[in-house]
């Protein structure tokens, strides 16, 4: 296979049989939408949606020194994560630049599952492997060992309960437990990227189609629909969740992104980027260069990544993500803007959309927060 040929998930034929529009995403052929991305988005907000996320990058870290390695390699306090729990964290360069944002699951006392973004999986694998020197731990590429299926939305707990004996009521947000779903062995994690309650199911690729079909049948009465990456992007945008390559990059630190809370300076020992991030934290507190904010359009024109944010003809920031919001019924965006213009309600802010000044309201993120 040539290096340019896209990879296919275990559900590729099934997506095509459902009439999915496919797209190349991070070297994978993935479903963009099955019909209307707006309908898929609203189904997740009100009922439930089913996603194939098998392009994500799973990396297993095992051994007596696994916790110490991850505490050194990542910015979070991974050693403090209990067995069966998960943590959102980041891996940074020595200069503090973000290599990726991650979720780390502690499966056993000496076993962790690191889940990287598809576009950065190899970068994260290489960094962890390089940083493992001197630690009694093994870093293993498990990208081919898992298919990942997510069911997201307010109806997702009921749908999943009908297919498993696992204690879903006792499964907290950012927790995971082994179980079986429709007879399929799975890691059942209460995580997601939509702003809704939901579950991510890590299974053997050979079982993926069986599990997808079982979830489809069990979810039909509740209004579950298959969902593509297009609505996943608008869902995470409404929820104010960052996307690597847009809100996060190697040119930004976690503090630049307003996510300094993931950096745990109080943990024992050194970690990659500690010195640079200490400086970044001090700068962010005294004089932040730019701040990540939400923007809501007063009109109908949609901003895209890279469009300038302006006040009185002066560029004061840049859009990182933008789309029509199915929930709000108006275009929305995330943008980095100068701190002086970052307060909600700041007057005169607009986006330069192909030479036209379009007025936008500055708001605090997220745009949408589910009722719990």
Curated annotation (Swiss-Prot):
Keywords: Aminotransferase, Transferase. Its EC number is 2.1.2.10. GO terms for biological process: glycine decarboxylation via glycine cleavage system. GO terms for cellular component: cytosol; glycine cleavage complex. PANTHER family: AMINOMETHYLTRANSFERASE, AMINOMETHYLTRANSFERASE, MITOCHONDRIAL. NCBIfam families: gcvT (TIGR00528), PRK00389.1 (NF001567). Belongs to the GcvT family. It comes from the Bacteria. This is Aminomethyltransferase. It holds the Pfam family GCV_T. HAMAP family: GcvT (MF_00259). The glycine cleavage system catalyzes the degradation of glycine. GO terms for molecular function: aminomethyltransferase activity; transaminase activity. The glycine cleavage system is composed of four proteins: P, T, L and H. It comes from Streptomyces avermitilis (strain ATCC 31267 / DSM 46492 / JCM 5070 / NBRC 14893 / NCIMB 12804 / NRRL 8165 / MA-4680). It catalyses: N(6)-[(R)-S(8)-aminomethyldihydrolipoyl]-L-lysyl-[protein] + (6S)-5,6,7,8-tetrahydrofolate = N(6)-[(R)-dihydrolipoyl]-L-lysyl-[protein] + (6R)-5,10-methylene-5,6,7,8-tetrahydrofolate + NH4(+). Gene3D superfamilies: Aminomethyltransferase beta-barrel domains, Aminomethyltransferase fragment, Probable tRNA modification gtpase trme, domain 1.
């Amino acid at each position: 296979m040539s290096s340019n040929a896209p990879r296919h998930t275990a559900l590729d034929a099934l997506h095509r049989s459902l009439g999915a529009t496919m797209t190349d995403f991070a070297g994978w052929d993935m479903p963009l939408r099955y019909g209307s991305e707006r309908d898929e988005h609203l189904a997740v907000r009100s009922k439930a949606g089913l996603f194939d996320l098998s392009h994500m990058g799973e990396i297993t870290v095992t051994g007596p020194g696994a916790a110490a390695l991850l505490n050194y390699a990542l910015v979070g306090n991974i050693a403090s994560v209990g067995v069966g729990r998960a943590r959102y964290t980041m891996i940074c360069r020595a200069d503090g630049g973000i290599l990726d944002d991650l979720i780390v699951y502690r499966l056993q006392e000496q076993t962790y599952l690191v889940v990287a973004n598809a576009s950065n999986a190899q970068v994260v694998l290489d960094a962890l492997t390089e940083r493992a020197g001197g630690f009694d731990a093994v870093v293993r590429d498990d990208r081919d060992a898992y298919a990942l299926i997510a069911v997201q939305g307010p109806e997702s707990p009921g749908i999943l309960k009908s297919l498993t004996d696992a204690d879903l009521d006792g499964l907290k947000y950012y927790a995971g437990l082994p179980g079986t779903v429709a007879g399929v062995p799975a890691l059942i994690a209460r995580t997601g990227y939509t702003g809704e309650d939901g579950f991510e199911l890590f299974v053997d690729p050979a079982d993926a189609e069986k599990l997808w079909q079982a979830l489809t049948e069990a979810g039909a009465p509740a209004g579950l629909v298959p969902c593509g990456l297009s609505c996943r992007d608008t869902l995470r945008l409404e929820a104010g969740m960052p996307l690597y390559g847009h809100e996060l990059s190697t040119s930004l630190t976690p503090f630049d992104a307003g996510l300094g809370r993931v950096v745990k300076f109080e943990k024992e020992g050194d970690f990659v980027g500690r010195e640079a991030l200490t400086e970044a934290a001090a700068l962010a507190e005294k004089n932040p260069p730019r701040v990540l904010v939400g923007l809501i359009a007063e009109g109908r024109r949609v901003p895209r990544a890279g469009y300038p944010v302006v006040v009185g003809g002066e560029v004061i920031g840049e859009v990182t993500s933008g789309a029509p919001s199915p929930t709000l019924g108006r275009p929305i965006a995330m943008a980095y803007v100068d701190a002086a213009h970052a307060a909600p309600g700041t007057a005169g802010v607009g986006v330069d959309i192909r030479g036209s000044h379009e007025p936008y309201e500055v708001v605090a993120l997220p745009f949408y927060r589910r009722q719990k």
